[in-house]
Structures are given as structure tokens and as C-alpha cells.
Amino acid sequence: MEDKGHIIAIGGGGFGRNPNHRKIEKYILDLTGKEKPNIVFFPTASAEDKGYIVNYYKCFTKLNCDPSHVTLFQRTPRLDSIINKADVIYVGGGNTKSMLAVWREWKLDKLLLKAYNQGKVLCGVSAGAICWFEQGITDSWASNLNSMECLGFLPEMACPHYQEEKDRRPDVHEMLKKGKCGPGWAIDGGAAVHFNKG
């Protein structure tokens, strides 16, 4: 792997819905250039849903990698050590706002930026896709879609589930018209966008 960070933003779906559909996951692992890369999963946004974690292992134990996951709501291990050992950091979907609040409390945001600058592969689906951008379109609020500030590793805005949820497209267009979000990326479910640092 070249000494440049990678971010793979997945618009929806993935192993959370179908652990047997693994094309994007294989692509992510191949980016490391390693025979058996270490991949760590952060299911924070889903409140660490057990079924989601099971699907993660169903998917990645069938691929040539060493999968693990981290919980932040139980006894939390040393995050710096885990991030240092990881080749791939995979972030699951769920509530983006709550996830980022927890991450910042644990200073995980700073560790992830360091990992990106060291050339590791950062990736994720839905909340795990938009978290890397300056802005993300999220349904973290039950009432309606909102634009929120995210980590800012990548410029502009990102919206997942663009064709999967009927309100996404018109709501995003309305937000753009009203200046509630900037230009950016609308990512369909089952699709991914690859950003290469440098």
C-alpha cells in the first residue's frame, strides 16, 4: 500500500443487510496490499447492535483477513493500540450524530485522522460513509433529514441512500436550494466512492 490514506464511502447495504454480498469488502481489503490485513469494525452508530456485529464476522471471516471489533459502551480497550495495528477501519451505519459525540469523547476522531495520514484504509456504510466529510446528510433526528458537521477529512457534503429512500433526493435538492448544505456526493445504496489522499 502506498503511504496515502484511502477512504471508501458506501451509500447503503453492505454486510449489514447481506453478509454474502462481498464485492466492495474484497475491494477494500485489496487496497491494503497485504496478504491477510487486520480489519477493525466500529459499530458505534448502531448502538453496537449484536446482530450487526454477527453479520460483520459472517462476511469478513470468509475473506482473507483478520477481523475484530471495538465496543465503546462496555469496557473500552486502548484505542491507540488498536488503530495502530489496524490496516482497515470499517465504520457501521446508524446514528451519525450520536456516534461522533461518543468518538470525540474518546478522542477517536484524532486517532482516525492520524491513521488516515499514515496511509490506512478508512471506510464505512451510511453513517460510516458520511462521517469522513465536512458535512453529512443524516436521519439522526427522527423528524426529518438534516445536514450536520462531520469529521472534515474530506471536503464537501455526502448523502447516503440516495436512491434507496424516496425522500432523500427531493430533500437534498431542497437543502441545496436553501443553502442548508454545500455541494457534494450523493451515493446510492450498494455503491461506493473511493477517495485517495495525495
Regions of interest found by a model, annotated:
Residues 1-2, 32-33, 81-83, 114-116, ...:
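Solvent-exposed alpha-helices and their adjacent loops that cap or buttress functional pockets
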Residues 1-92:
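N-terminal beta1-alpha1 cap of cysteine-dependent amidohydrolase-like domains
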Residues 10, 131-133, 195-196:
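Short beta-strand-to-turn element immediately C-terminal to the catalytic PLP-Schiff-base lysine
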Residues 13, 93-97, 128:
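Short glycine-rich anion-binding loops that position phosphate/pyrophosphate groups of nucleotides
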Residues 22-24, 54-57, 103-107, 137-140, ...:
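Short, glycine/charged-enriched secondary-structure capping and boundary segments
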Residues 98-169:
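Class I SAM-dependent methyltransferase SAM-binding "motif I" and its flanking Rossmann-like core
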Residues 153-154, 158-198:
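Conserved anion/nucleotide-ligand pocket segment
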